[in-house]
A protein has these predicted regions:
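Glycan-recognition and catalytic cores of secretory/periplasmic carbohydrate-active enzymes
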Residues: 1-236
Length: 236
């Protein structure tokens, strides 16, 4: 519903808010756009997160020899790319803006640490999912570039000391508390440091328990999937 219906119907931008009958409420909190839990518009970080969750769910279905919908991997790539295009460096400075409207125009320019962490995790997960499908290095180069760029950003602007990440920056990448104060969570950063070192499936906790750290390749046979090309010539 979230990815294959709502994101697809809204140009791969995921609506955040719904009525009790699951109708999108696109104007919700327009008058309070920086609400810490229910911001107005589109949150690119959630697009990145849903892209990762989609390939992880797909990995779970493969692992259990269940039917895998054809749309899953391609949709993950589309929602990842829309979030990247809308959010990354769009106001002239490094970093992801917090929110945009449904045309991709930035609304809240603050940079949240969790957004770039989800970008790091999503780029690593999609890259590995493609490799697990038997795709070549040229198909994953884009995700490797994103991964390295976002790791570099985190190191330059977010990591204060080992294990200490600044949670919010302003549009000029200076510490801010407009939305959040302090350091309310660590799990996004922890995931970002581990995702590239683990398989797409099982989950991080189970993979660590099984001793899969630094063994990211799938134990299952490669699956063929249709390449999703970018650039001047569009999709192949």
């Amino acid at each position: 519903f979230a990815v294959n219906v709502q994101a697809r119907e809204h140009g791969w931008r995921l609506p955040e808010h719904y009525s009790t009958s699951w109708e999108p409420r696109l104007d919700y909190n327009r008058d309070e756009p920086a609400h810490p839990f229910r911001p107005y518009g589109v949150t690119p970080g959630h697009g990145l997160e849903w892209a990762r969750l989609t390939v992880q769910l797909r990995g779970a279905l493969i692992n259990r020899s269940m039917s895998v919908p054809d749309w899953m991997l391609e949709a993950a790539e589309h929602i990842f790319e829309q979030a990247r295009t809308d959010g990354w460096r769009v106001d002239g400075a490094p970093g992801f803006v917090y929110t945009t409207d449904f045309d991709g125009k930035p609304v809240v320019h603050e940079r949240m640490h969790w957004v770039v962490c989800e970008g790091i995790s999503a780029s690593a997960a999609i890259r590995q999912a493609l490799l697990d499908d038997g795709r070549g290095e040229i198909d994953v180069e884009h995700y490797e570039h994103c991964y390295r760029a976002w790791i570099d950003y985190a190191e330059e602007f977010l990591i204060e000391a080992p294990g200490v990440w600044t949670h919010e920056l302003d549009r000029d990448n200076r510490p801010s508390t407009r939305t959040w104060a302090g350091h309310p969570d660590i799990y996004h950063a922890l995931q970002a440091t581990l995702m590239a070192r683990l398989p797409v499936w099982p989950t991080i906790g189970q993979a660590l328990a099984e001793g899969r750290l630094d063994e990211p390749n799938s134990l299952l046979p490669a699956r063929a999937s249709k390449p999703h090309r970018r650039g001047f010539f569009g999709r192949a």
